[in-house]
């Protein structure tokens, strides 16, 4: 079997086991945390809290999470390395850039169409993270991440999507995305990726579980991509029963082999008051799928075989397909 890089080093893809394909550990605005550190508080306590929560997840039967925290979401790999070293859970880390609008100012002058023009420096950065490691940690990214939300394909967002597509073709690392499903943004992403020559079967279109539009989901699948049914617990966007129903319905339509399950949860998110989350979204945590979602899916006719496909087989297949291409 092929190998996949994790925060503790490479593993055989056969050892991924039960995998949640769209999670986070810490999400923060790094400059805010550095200059106004009160909300973050004690580093050791935050790390210990994450170790405990991920340990609970491992004990519940999950073997691997994919941490899709990239530039723009506060990625800091030395912190993730500390967490990974103290838990048996595999953590696959990501590269890419998260924005709904413009690129960070660092990229303003350099790159295609910018004042100083030149090649896309983002692509080279992403490739370095995958092939050589992130900063001086020696930890290599295993997946690429980008986002398209309500503003749509702004110039900055389109630039990131194309850079991610180019890095994917050079490395073979799969792509996973954030989308605004209600506005069918996954189709925009597929169009840009296709223009860049991406094999869309190597792409997970994220947050598809926010939608109950079967036509939209069928269109994404027809183009080849996987559906990320990956926001279980974010009931303020789509309620629990709707999320369960759409997964069950797509399974009925024969698409268990094109879906992955996850929560998009984290141990810390500085954009939301910590006391608010348990009140507004009490199910938004790492254990929700195993505690609540799986039993509900079974009640709706989803079989153990289909659950194994979505939680084990599909993640393995996504990461097994390796190598760059033209």
Curated annotation (Swiss-Prot):
Its cofactor is Zn(2+). Binds 2 Zn(2+) ions per subunit. Keywords: Hydrolase, Metal-binding, Zinc. Transmembrane segments: none annotated. The modification N6-carboxylysine is found at residue 145. GO terms for molecular function: hydrolase activity, acting on ester bonds; zinc ion binding. It comes from the Bacteria. CDD domains: PTE (cd00530). Disulfide bonds: none annotated. Zn(2+) 1 binds at residues 22, 24, 145, 264. Belongs to the metallo-dependent hydrolases superfamily. Phosphotriesterase family. Was identified as a high-confidence drug target. This is Phosphotriesterase homology protein. It comes from Mycobacterium tuberculosis (strain ATCC 25618 / H37Rv).
């Amino acid at each position: 079997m092929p190998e996949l890089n994790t925060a503790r080093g490479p593993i055989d893809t056969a050892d991924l086991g039960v995998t949640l394909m769209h999670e986070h550990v810490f999400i923060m605005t790094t400059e805010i945390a550095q200059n106004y550190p009160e909300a973050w508080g004690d580093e050791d306590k935050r790390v210990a809290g994450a170790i405990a929560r991920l340990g609970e997840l491992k004990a519940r039967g999950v073997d691997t999470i994919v941490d899709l925290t990239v530039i723009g979401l506060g990625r800091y790999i030395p912190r993730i390395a500390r967490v990974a070293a103290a838990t048996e859970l595999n953590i696959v880390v990501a590269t890419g850039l998260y924005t709904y609008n413009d690129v960070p100012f660092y990229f303003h002058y350099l790159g295609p169409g910018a004042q100083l023009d030149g090649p896309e420096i983002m692509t080279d950065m992403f490739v370095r993270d995958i092939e050589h490691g992130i900063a001086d940690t020696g930890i290599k990214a295993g997946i690429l991440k980008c986002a398209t939300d309500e503003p749509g394909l702004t110039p900055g967002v389109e630039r990131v999507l194309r850079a991610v597509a180019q890095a994917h073709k050079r490395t073979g690392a799969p792509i996973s995305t954030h989308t605004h499903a209600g506005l069918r943004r996954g189709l925009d992403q597929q169009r840009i990726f296709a223009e860049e020559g991406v094999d869309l079967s190597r792409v997970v279109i994220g947050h598809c579980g926010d939608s109950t539009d079967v036509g939209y989901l069928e269109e994404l699948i027809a183009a080849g991509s996987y559906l990320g049914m990956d926001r279980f617990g974010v009931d303020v966007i789509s309620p629990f029963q709707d999320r369960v129903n759409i997964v069950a319905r797509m399974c009925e339509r024969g698409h268990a082999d094109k879906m992955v399950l996850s929560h998009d949860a984290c141990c810390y998110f500085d954009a939301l008051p910590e006391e608010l989350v348990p009140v507004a979204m009490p199910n938004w945590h790492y254990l929700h799928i195993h505690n609540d979602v799986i039993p509900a899916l079974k009640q709706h006719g989803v079989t153990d075989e289909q659950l194994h496909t979505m939680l084990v087989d599909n993640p393995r297949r996504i990461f097994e397909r390796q190598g760059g291409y033209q």
